[in-house]
Amino acid sequence: MNIHEYQGKEIFRSMGVAVPEGRVAFTAEEAVEKAKELNSDVYVVKAQIHAGGRGKAGGVKITKSLSEVETYAKELLGKTLVTHQTGPEGKEIKRLYIEEGCAIQKEYYVGFVIDRATDQVTLMASEEGGTEIEEVAAKTPEKIFKETIDPVIGLSPFQARRIAFNINIPKESVNKAAKFLLALYNVFIEKDCSIVEINPLVTTADGDVLALDAKINFDDNALFRHKDVVELRDLEEEDPKEIEASKHDLSYIALDGDIGCMVNGAGLAMATMDTINHFGGNPANFLDAGGSATREKVTEAFKIILGDENVKGIFVNIFGGIMKCDVIAEGIVEAVKEVDLTLPLVVRLEGTNVELGKKILKDSGLAIEPAATMAEGAQKIVKLVKEA
């Protein structure tokens, strides 16, 4: 689950992570009133959407004038902002964050992530702040420093100071930076985050260390422990199909291809998408039906996939372990009938009760193309979509 920058900064502030003063506004008039409350000489007007790259896309404005705060607010509110993370369709700006400006001395990058190679939380930092960390990693990887964190001990003060020294935080601000990083790590752990990222972290002319940005992603599996976090969810920022999928315990992510995918298991889903790409196709989605799919769940999965008007064919790739192939087959048959499917459909089943599942599909009399392997299924659906 993602949240807005201003919500992230409220969490930071409540847990001892230093941030500039700021207020959220939903109208141009409110933006001016919130700016007045800051009692600052410099104002930063920031578009609030669930995507990075806002500054480069024109979604961040700096001014010393209250009248310009109003002008910028009117310009941004209601505008569709397109960044490298939104896709070409962009996202509509429905709220702004009005923040006090600060005398920036230097910009840095810091982030806590889960390193899948070590299965531990890792602190990443660089003195190349304000730019995409992926670019830094590609062009100057030697400028990224990492600290692997022992889950029993947590982030140690010496690790925080070492990172501060490595990214050339001024000596007079090293202790403040270490305190900042320790507080930020506490946010990551206490709120069950999957990512906590600040780009940029800045040092100021006064020697302060502040978070000028706040990106927080939460582990969806732990949200039951954080009712306060769930209340921050902005459904308007999410794909309606993803929202509908979550209601049925389906993991769905929309992509920009034309071949719908329904798979059980995240690993198999990614392998399926890679195989489709390998044979010249483009997946329209990631959809993990999980290990406990019912007939009803399969039907909902089909409806969600078909909610994407770009879909020209569907590939179902199921390995029946906990999930039995005959149950899936029955669900597929019911779903095809209920949604009156006219698009090409390829189904590959393997595992528990696979022969019974194949018989159910064959006896249905429906236009369902069987496949014995994932590769065969991917080839078939790519061919059928291209011929359609």
Swiss-Prot record:
The keyword Oxidoreductase does not apply. GO terms for molecular function: ATP binding; magnesium ion binding; succinate-CoA ligase (ADP-forming) activity; succinate-CoA ligase (GDP-forming) activity. PANTHER family: SUCCINATE--COA LIGASE [GDP-FORMING] SUBUNIT BETA, MITOCHONDRIAL, SUCCINYL-COA SYNTHETASE BETA CHAIN. Succinyl-CoA synthetase functions in the citric acid cycle (TCA), coupling the hydrolysis of succinyl-CoA to the synthesis of either ATP or GTP and thus represents the only step of substrate-level phosphorylation in the TCA. The beta subunit provides nucleotide specificity of the enzyme and binds the substrate succinate, while the binding sites for coenzyme A and phosphate are found in the alpha subunit. It comes from Staphylococcus aureus (strain MRSA252). Residues 9-244 form the ATP-grasp domain. Substrate binds at residues 264, 321-323. ATP binds at residues 46, 53-55, 99, 102, 107. Belongs to the succinate/malate CoA ligase beta subunit family. Pathway: Carbohydrate metabolism; tricarboxylic acid cycle; succinate from succinyl-CoA (ligase route): step 1/1. Heterotetramer of two alpha and two beta subunits. PROSITE patterns: ATP_GRASP, SUCCINYL_COA_LIG_3. This is Succinate--CoA ligase [ADP-forming] subunit beta. Its EC number is 6.2.1.5. Gene3D superfamilies: ATP-grasp fold, A domain (3.30.1490.20), ATP-grasp fold, B domain (3.30.470.20), Succinyl-CoA synthetase domains (3.40.50.261). InterPro entries: ATP-grasp, ATP-grasp_succ-CoA_synth-type, ATP_grasp_subdomain_1, Succ-CoA_synthase_bsu_CS, SUCC_ACL_C, Succ_CoA_ligase-like_bsu, Succinyl-CoA_synth-like. The gene is sucC. Its cofactor is Mg(2+). GO terms for cellular component: cytosol; succinate-CoA ligase complex. It holds the Pfam family ATP-grasp_2. It is an enzyme of class 6 (ligase). Binds 1 Mg(2+) ion per subunit. The keyword ATP-binding applies.
